[in-house]
Amino acid sequence: MSPPRKLHIKSYGCQMNVYDAQRMVDALAPEGFVETANVDDADLVILNTCHIREKASEKVYSELGRLRVARDEAANHGRRMQIAVAGCVAQAEGAEIIRRAPVVDVVVGPQSYHNLPQLLAKAEQHGRALETEFPIEDKFGVLPQPAPDAIRARGISAFVTVQEGCDKFCTFCVVPYTRGAEMSRPVAAIVEDVKRLAENGVREVTLIGQNVNAYHGDGPDRLAWSLGRLVRRLAEIPGIVRLRYSTSHPNDVNDDLLAAHRDLPALMPFVHLPVQSGSDRILAAMNRKHTADDYRRVIDRFRLASEAIAFSSDFIVGFPGETERDFSATLALVAQIGYAGAYSFKYSPRPGTPAADMAEMVPAAVMDERLEQLQQLIDQQQSAFNKAAIGRTVEVLFERAGRKPGQIVGRTAYLQPAHVMAPDSIIGKVLPVRVDSLERYSLLGELASATSRPADAMAATGA
């Protein structure tokens, strides 16, 4: 029997890439690959790339330079290391990657991960393999399912892709070009995925997509289901106690989703709703197709559905042409909404996007100053949100052992890390925790009760 081949995947960027990395592991497991955390031991290294942030391509080529050294060292010991570039940089640059970095054996776009075994074999025979087309077949229908042991090893929380691609064409964003048009998976396939996860110990599922609330998958009644209707079906699955979704677009929030937040205890009251700017002028230049007031009204609709809902968001400072007045409008929006957390970034041009050709680039020093000012406000809001938990009892889903002996770590409904001293038998359970103090962004406390119910019992009762 041949010894297993070792696989190392380095993922950059979004939650979708984390999910994609797991599916690549699943696709390669039948070929005898097992994961390793040590890149130097790997027979195959995959860089699972992201094209959203600044200098994404340069980071990939820098990493490939380091891998060339590791590959040469492996060859000196009589071992062949294959190198693959996957993800959105692979989709955007294709053959250019092989031209600039001959060390690369395989370049594969996000829609073709199910073909990885064949691409690796092709590279073994012919030296290189490239696949960045958008194939007709649904990759989700042909990717192997993870083995039960693999599911259990990944913990009690899992991602499930329900939607991929984007039709919004924001002027700063490459996603429509690298992930393609919006595609929604059938309801039945998603239900089967989540059932399989629940049967193997998963208690929390995050539904992911580039524009997840645009979900419109075919249901068993042959009608297109909304995200809200899908969530209702998934909440019925025994064992699933928490459901989340990310990332959303304000224009696709509908009554079905709001009603699900109103009615379903399993749907967590924490919504990531990017807005990018508080200036109507900049929002128009970004092609967001909504105004700041439109966004405020969406927030109000969520809060009417459930007073418990809190929000996070994404912001870009220094978009071409952004003035001090535009930036002040962003600060005003943040101050008015009050976020539990948010991500802020300096604008960086993505080749091939309309914004990359816009004039009036904001000076780097101005962007730095605005980013610092915005992040200070966001940090203040996040700190206030976390401090409000002190003295309260909150529900925590416990996930794993902590760094300290006897410490168990879980997360609240708002994704705040929570630490208690307790036996590891509480992992997989939702328990009340009395919060005593904070340590940076984590809540510290004690179990509020010695009695508990496992997460699957809570899911079944709707608690």
Curated annotation (Swiss-Prot):
Quaternary organization: Monomer.
Organism ancestry: Bacteria, Pseudomonadati, Pseudomonadota, Alphaproteobacteria, Hyphomicrobiales
Catalytic activity: N(6)-dimethylallyladenosine(37) in tRNA + (sulfur carrier)-SH + AH2 + 2 S-adenosyl-L-methionine = 2-methylsulfanyl-N(6)-dimethylallyladenosine(37) in tRNA + (sulfur carrier)-H + 5'-deoxyadenosine + L-methionine + A + S-adenosyl-L-homocysteine + 2 H(+)
Native organism: Rhodopseudomonas palustris (strain ATCC BAA-98 / CGA009)
Protein name (Swiss-Prot/TrEMBL): tRNA-2-methylthio-N(6)-dimethylallyladenosine synthase
Gene: miaB
UniProt-listed Enzyme Commission number(s): 2.8.4.3
Cofactor: [4Fe-4S] cluster
InterPro entries xrefs: Elp3/MiaA/NifB-like_rSAM, Methylthiotransferase, Methylthiotransferase_CS, Methylthiotransferase_N, Methylthiotransferase_N_sf, MiaB_methiolase, rSAM, rSAM_horseshoe
Annotated disulfide bonds: none
